[in-house]
């Protein structure tokens, strides 16, 4: 998305940290660090009772609170496939939600965009050629991506 990259670079170069933060969080919505958080059901429960996808979960079963899919669910997020850095903060569930929200959320909100800012200020930023320019992951976690700039 060259247009989105150019807009993020413009925010970085003009020191518009709030705008840059919004671009970073919106980009992370499309490819979050982790797909969700594992949890253990404390009691038997039936989800979606009375619907065609009713599911029974037994106490002690492992479940995944899949916030990655929730952030792309049109019942939860308006126009989920559209890149929109002006979304309400409630659309972002990268760090969980509610009582089980990661306490690192606030640190990340304050620092993630600042770590990317010096890179985004560079001219002609691009992926390195060949395999180094492809995002390498270890499971859902980004491991390496080499970029070049002038």
Task: Report the location of each language-model feature.
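Cytochrome P450
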Residues: 1-150
